[in-house]
Amino acid sequence: MKRFHVHVAVADLAQSTRFYSAMFGASPSVQKDDYAKWMLDDPRLNFAISSRGNAAGVNHLGMQAGDGAELAGLHARLLDADSTVTAEKGGSCCYARSDKYWVTDPSGIVWESFHTLESIPTFGGNAARSAMPENTAKAACCG
């Protein structure tokens, strides 16, 4: 089952972690020095914050696929949207290795469709960023 994803760049990670923990009524499922993530079931949401953005605010939005078949379906929808889609296979970002597709909507909002393959011990970096349109690369997860 798919899960909505939001990644927000924050100015103060500790203060933001306390705020969102209280708001969601849950502690982060992943917490690092520069990153925190809540995997919520109600609402079905993957909400992440990090101190790695250029400015505080929404970094990107996305859809997390439950498996490779769901990701293929999301990819097909992105292609149907007549947008430039950038593939990132086995990308390392946000303490996870994932297969991803990046797209920018007509208003310049960056969207990520992804399937997480495994957790990794480092924040990582986007190998595909150099192939992305400039506005997408600037806002992508590891910006």
What are these regions (language model features)?
Residues K32-Y35, A55-G57, C94-D99:
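Short acidic/glycine-enriched loop/turn segments that link adjacent beta-strands
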Residues M1-K2, H7-N46:
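Core segments of cupin and vicinal oxygen chelate
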Residues S27, N46-A48, T84-K89:
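A short linear hydrophobic-aromatic micro-motif
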Residues A11, S50-R52, G66:
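Residue-level recognition of strand-loop junctions within catalytic nucleotide-signaling folds
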Residues M1-A14, R44, H60-L61, T122-G143:
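N-terminal beta-strand motif that seeds the catalytic metal site of vicinal oxygen chelate
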Residues D41-L45, N54-A56, G66-L71:
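Short, charged/polar surface micro-motifs in flexible loops or helix N-caps
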